[in-house]
Amino acid sequence: MASRGVNKVILIGNLGQDPEVRYMPSGGAVANITIATSETWRDKATGEQKEKTEWHRVTLYGKLAEVAGEYLRKGSQVYIEGQLQTRKWQDQSGQDRYSTEVVVQGYNGIMQMLGGRAQQGGMPAQGGMNVPAQQGSWGQPQQPAKQHQPMQQSAPQQYSQPQYNEPPMDFDDDIPF
C-alpha cells in the first residue's frame, strides 16, 4: 500500500503575545498565537555563543481556542501538536499572499500548557493541562472531561496509604471441587 505521507508538527516554545480569540458565525472559537522557539550554539571560529529564534504562527480551533484564550499569556510555555497548512488570501491591493501556519484542531491536535503557576495565570503548578482537541480521540478510551479548579492556599492535603486488595486472614485456598 502506498503511503500518503505524514503532516505533523510538534513545537515547544513561549508565546510572543497574548492569544487573539474570536468567534466564527457558527459559534466556534478560533485563537491565533505566535510561539517562539530558540536554539543556541557556540560558533567554532570565534567561540561566541549564538542564538537563533524562530517564530511560528499557530491557529487553534474549538475548545482548545477557548482554553488558550483563558489561560495562556505572553511568555507562557506551551507544547503544541498540529498540522502545517498554507492558506492563500488577498491583501488590500488584490495581491495574492500566502501564510503558513500550524493548525491545531480535530482528533490529532494537542495543546499542553507547561511551566509553573506564575506563567499560567493561576493554573496549578504541578504538571500542565493536556487538552486534546476532541474528546474520545481515535484509539483512546472516552473519559469525562476533568474540571480544573485553581489551587486553594490551604493546609497541605494528607494522603492516605494505598489500600491493597488482600484476601481476609481466614481465606481458604482449597478449591471445593
Curated annotation (Swiss-Prot):
PROSITE patterns for the chain: SSB
Keywords: DNA damage, DNA recombination, DNA repair, DNA replication, DNA-binding
SUPFAM superfamilies with a match to the protein in the record: Nucleic acid-binding proteins
Low complexity composition bias: residue spans: 118-129, 140-164
Annotated SSB domain residues: 6-111
A molecular function GO annotation: single-stranded DNA binding
Listed GO biological process terms: DNA recombination; DNA repair; DNA replication
Xref: InterPro entries: NA-bd_OB-fold, Primosome_PriB/ssb, ssDNA-bd
One Pfam family named in its UniProt record: SSB
Region feature Disordered, mapped onto this chain: 118-177
Sequence motif Important for interaction with partner proteins, residues: 172-177
GO cellular component: nucleoid
Function, as annotated: Plays an important role in DNA replication, recombination and repair. Binds to ssDNA and to an array of partner proteins to recruit them to their sites of action during DNA metabolism.
PANTHER family (UniProt xref): SINGLE-STRANDED DNA-BINDING PROTEIN
NCBIfam families in UniProt: PRK09010.1 (NF006533), ssb (TIGR00621)
Subunit structure: Homotetramer.
Protein name listed in UniProt: Single-stranded DNA-binding protein
Species of the source: Vibrio cholerae serotype O1 (strain ATCC 39315 / El Tor Inaba N16961)
